């Protein structure tokens, strides 16, 4: 926690799945719980997808085929199993790293902790490109353990509204996942006329393998 800490500000970047993970409480109560742990701001990782989408749309139109850089396990899988496709991995930082970089650039005293469902993100924040932007990664289970250690009963807390638009302005008004954000960015950049957009979403390693073949 960062109570009594005046040297830096602690930011929690939360994965979109946080709303379904803590099914026994409302999202606003979970956000309050995170703030009670000593975080100054709670920021949605989804904002990073909007930031990535604009540059990713151009890269997609240039290359004709692109795989997302969102999931570090998927990126590692392509590098090992399909090395010839390596050039088609998006060169952008993942949405989480992108929003974390933005936070660090706008607040030099920021420390960023990513909270998400997947341990693969722990490997991502060790990577050289990402290390400057993300200071730590914890899973939802670890977050729950922190709540328990502070005797925070989440379902009895008041709700805090997650209003990131006020921090980050209108640039992030779009939502609907990376595929929708890229589709919108193609239109905004005038690339939709010359490029046919056919996103494929895969759930799990088998679907990924089948799609890449």
Question: What is each PLM-predicted segment?
Answer:
Residues 2-213:
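Iron-sulfur-associated redox domains of electron-transfer enzymes in respiratory
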């Amino acid at each position: 926690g960062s109570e009594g800490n005046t040297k830096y500000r602690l930011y929690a970047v939360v994965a979109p799945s946080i709303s379904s993970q803590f099914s026994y409480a409302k999202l606003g109560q979970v956000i309050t719980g995170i703030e009670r742990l000593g975080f100054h701001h709670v920021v949605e990782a989804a904002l990073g997808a909007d930031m990535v989408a604009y540059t990713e749309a151009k890269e997609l139109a240039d290359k004709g085929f692109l795989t997302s850089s969102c999931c570090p396990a998927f990126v590692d899988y392509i590098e090992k199993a399909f090395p010839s496709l390596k050039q088609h991995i998006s060169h952008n930082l993942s949405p989480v790293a992108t929003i974390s970089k933005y936070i660090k650039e706008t607040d030099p005293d920021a420390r960023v902790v990513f909270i998400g469902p997947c341990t693969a993100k722990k490997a991502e924040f060790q990577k050289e490109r990402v290390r400057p932007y993300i200071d730590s990664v914890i899973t939802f289970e670890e977050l729950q353990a922190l709540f328990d250690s502070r005797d925070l009963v989440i379902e009895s807390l008041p709700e805090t509204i997650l209003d990131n638009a006020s921090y980050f302005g209108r640039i992030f008004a779009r939502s609907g996942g990376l595929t929708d954000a890229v589709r919108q960015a193609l239109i905004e950049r005038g690339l939709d006329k010359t490029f046919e957009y056919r996103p494929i979403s895969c759930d799990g390693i088998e679907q990924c393998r089948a799609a890449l073949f």
